[in-house]
Amino acid sequence: METLDYRFEGHTAVQFPRGAVLVGVLASGNLEILLEPAALDGAMTVRIITAAKGFGSVWQAVISDFAQRHPLRDVRISINDAGATPAVVSLRLDQAVETLLAGEPR
């Protein structure tokens, strides 16, 4: 297992309709993503726990791209990965933000 941590300055304030947003299913062989409100002085943090070692540069690229598209303020993102491709990671991250902004459980 490998743990990767990232921090980005956020610009977009969001309101959580409930305590957290969870998308994906780890048992599916992909990943699960949890978004939680957190007092981070306007930042967004991302912690990735992955079974695939040695892909830090790929994760950095995917997460940096996400942070440019969605610079969320005071949000903690936790990703539990079981070998998802970068495209699936991006899709799930966008799904999590869409779910958060829609305020609907999925």
UniProtKB/Swiss-Prot annotation:
PTM comment: Covalently binds the prosthetic group of malonate decarboxylase.
- Record flagged with keyword Kinase: no
Quote the Pfam families the UniProt record gives.
Answer: ACP (PF06857)
* GO CC term, one of those recorded: cytoplasm
Q: O-(phosphoribosyl dephospho-coenzyme A)serine-modified residues are where?
A: 28
Q: Which domain of life is it from?
A: Bacteria
Ordered alphabetically, the record's keywords are: Cytoplasm, Phosphoprotein
Name the principal localization, coarsely classed.
Answer: cytoplasm
Named from the GO MF annotations, one term is:
acyl carrier activity
- Which family does this protein fall into? Belongs to the MdcC family.
Role according to the record: Subunit of malonate decarboxylase, it is an acyl carrier protein to which acetyl and malonyl thioester residues are bound via a 2'-(5''-phosphoribosyl)-3'-dephospho-CoA prosthetic group and turn over during the catalytic mechanism.
- The name this protein goes by in its record: Malonate decarboxylase acyl carrier protein
Q: Which organism is it from?
A: Stenotrophomonas maltophilia (strain K279a)
